[in-house]
């Protein structure tokens, strides 16, 4: 990564959880000149369309790679290469995010974007050369890249781990002095369980950032009183978190906007809203990305009038704290018979049923009403429930036109790299994007 920045190349980390078809799309989208792949993921690569690309493999001993592949060690040089002559707004990394149309869009982040993100992280968490970042998040995630760069620029180190293994992680914290970690559910809970089982107080851990439920954060507070859980809000498109604060400072909020960014809330006509009013969260500043790769129409809309329009809803209170409330209604709206139905409202009603563990609601074509509500649900272990029973249950709790017309029970729901239910992937799988 550092070598690419030095040379002026753009890095495109690919999510190894993608399907082979999705990987092929990403490769086609960016048309790379160089491909570096771990041996275990070669099976995800397309069979065609790689001609002309230099191909290097990780995990292969020198001399063992078969043409056209070479070991990544072939890229190593024993001489110094002068840095490329770049301006700060040239691209450094493309991270593909979910798209409304079901195809991932590549968010282009510049050198300036990532330097700004690194500086604000260093300042907020007071990073020093003594800090050690525990690299358990995958490096196709903007938070993982941000934590790595911030720690490095502060003079600290990152311990890159190939997978999240709680007992091993406890050992690394105790033996290596790990002080910083980014997590998503259920990682923190599993780490605390392992620490309790191993009799560890995780004494060196001081910064935990990510998403989790208040109960788990309370466990952290009790088990590791020296560690602070930080709440934050951000996107790939904002190079990471543009608001953050210790969770206990304002529980439930996403923290305060950082000094390098301006955050506002606007209505559907792009007019600023007063304090406390809910609208779309918009951002401007040096952390806002350069745009989606080869998506001019999307860029014109998303970056209109000098602001990045996040598609997320929220409000800013009188003390400047940002409160995230969900995706923009324009992004998530079902219209059976012209009526407005918001998925979150239906999902809340569904999850009141004691037999349900997870649920996601989408709109699907309907001959009579134009669009209908469809629910995909995961049952709790040992429970049974029919579609008819669930529809009747929900219909008793919200307006009848909002209840699902179709219910499908599934074993699991797809999730994003951030651990959230991937609604767009559900839509794509159902053939309705």
Each language-model region and where it sits:
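A short helix-loop-beta submotif of the ANL/AMP-binding
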Residues: 1-12, 16-20, 29-34, 131-132, ...
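ATP-dependent adenylate-forming carboxylate-activation enzymes
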Residues: 9-27, 39-42, 136, 156-175, ...
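AMP-binding/adenylate-forming catalytic core of the ANL superfamily
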Residues: 18-21, 35, 262, 269, ...
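ANL superfamily adenylate-forming
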Residues: 42-88, 195
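Conserved pre-ATP/AMP-binding loop-to-beta segment of ANL
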Residues: 74-96, 103, 126-132
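Conserved AMP-binding A3 loop
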Residues: 92-116
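Conserved AMP-binding/adenylation subdomain of ANL enzymes
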Residues: 115-132, 140-180, 194
């Amino acid at each position: 990564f550092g070598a690419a920045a030095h040379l002026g190349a753009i890095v495109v980390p690919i999510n190894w959880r993608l399907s082979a078809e999705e990987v092929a799309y990403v490769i086609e989208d960016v048309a790379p000149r160089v491909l570096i792949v771990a041996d275990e993921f070669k099976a995800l690569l397309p069979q065609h369309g790689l001609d002309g690309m230099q191909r290097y493999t990780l995990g292969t001993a020198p001399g063992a790679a078969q043409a056209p592949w070479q070991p990544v060690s072939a890229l190593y040089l024993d001489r110094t290469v002068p840095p490329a002559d770049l301006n700060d707004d040239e691209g450094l990394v493309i991270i593909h995010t979910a798209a409304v149309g079901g195809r991932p869009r590549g968010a282009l982040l510049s050198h300036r974007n990532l330097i700004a993100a690194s500086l604000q992280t260093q300042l907020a968490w007071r990073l020093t050369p003594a800090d050690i970042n525990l690299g358990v998040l995958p490096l196709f995630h903007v938070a993982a890249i941000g934590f790595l760069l911030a720690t490095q620029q502060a003079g600290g180190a990152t311990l890159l781990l190939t997978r999240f293994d709680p007992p091993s992680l406890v050992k690394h914290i105790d033996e290596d002095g790990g002080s910083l970690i980014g997590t998503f559910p259920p990682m923190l809970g599993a780490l605390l369980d392992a620490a309790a089982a191993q009799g560890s107080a995780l004494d060196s851990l001081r910064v935990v950032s990510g998403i989790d439920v208040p109960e788990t954060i309370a466990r952290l507070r009790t088990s590791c009183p020296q560690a602070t859980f930080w709440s934050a809000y951000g996107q790939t498109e904002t190079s990471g978190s543009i608001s953050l604060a210790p969770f206990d400072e304002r529980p439930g909020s996403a923290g305060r906007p950082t000094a390098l960014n301006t955050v506002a809330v606007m209505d559907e006509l792009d007019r600023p809203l007063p304090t406390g009013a809910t609208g779309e969260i918009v951002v401007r500043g040096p952390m806002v990305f350069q745009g989606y790769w080869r998506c001019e129409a999307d860029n014109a809309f998303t970056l209109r009038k000098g602001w990045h329009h996040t598609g997320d809803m929220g409000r800013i209170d009188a003390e400047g704290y940002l409160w995230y409330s969900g995706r923009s209604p324009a992004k998530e709206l079902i219209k059976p018979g012209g009526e407005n139905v918001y998925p979150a409202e239906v999902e809340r009603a569904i999850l009141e049923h004691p037999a349900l563990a997870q649920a996601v609601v989408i709109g699907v074509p309907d001959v009579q009403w134009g669009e209908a509500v469809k629910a995909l649900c995961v049952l709790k272990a040992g429970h049974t429930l029919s579609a008819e029973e669930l529809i009747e249950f929900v219909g008793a709790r919200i307006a009848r036109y909002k209840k699902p017309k179709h219910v499908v029970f599934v074993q699991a729901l797809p999730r994003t790299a951030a651990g959230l239910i991937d609604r767009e992937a559900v839509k794509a799988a159902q053939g309705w994007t």
